[in-house]
Amino acid sequence: MIQMQTNLDVADNSGARRVMCIKVLGGSKRRYATVGDIIVVSIKEAIPRGKVKKGDVMKAVVVRVAKDIRRADGSVIRFDRNAAVLINNQSEPVGTRIFGPVPRELRAKNHMKIISLAPEVL
């Protein structure tokens, strides 16, 4: 569960290393985001010569959450850290590579480009 002020790792090669959620999109009173949801983030840490720089405000898709994700078959999946992938206004990833596993719940939320770039889908 991601809310305002939550720090997340960046799971792509856009140049950002750490971001902070500043808004959960999808309704005026919406408080939490989970896997596949789009959030607005501020870049808190970035590498030199990356595609983005510290202080930029962008959209991101949440790809990993530490909170349990319950599936229809009764199984539960969870990750060690919260992570997101930066996207542009056309909902395409800014980076060209995705690092680490992503859950298949992204497929239901129509983030097929992220699924295809990911090295492993759980």
Swiss-Prot record:
SUPFAM superfamilies listed in its UniProt record: Ribosomal protein L14
Superkingdom in the source lineage: Bacteria
One BP term from GO: translation
InterPro entries referenced in this protein's UniProt entry, alphabetically: Ribosomal_uL14, Ribosomal_uL14_bac-type, Ribosomal_uL14_CS, Ribosomal_uL14_sf
GO cellular component terms given for this protein: cytosolic large ribosomal subunit
UniProt keyword list: Ribonucleoprotein, Ribosomal protein, RNA-binding, rRNA-binding
Subunit structure of this chain's protein: Part of the 50S ribosomal subunit. Forms a cluster with proteins L3 and L19. In the 70S ribosome, L14 and L19 interact and together make contacts with the 16S rRNA in bridges B5 and B8.
Record protein name field: Large ribosomal subunit protein uL14
Species: Nitrobacter hamburgensis (strain DSM 10229 / NCIMB 13809 / X14)
Source organism phylogeny: Bacteria, Pseudomonadati, Pseudomonadota, Alphaproteobacteria, Hyphomicrobiales
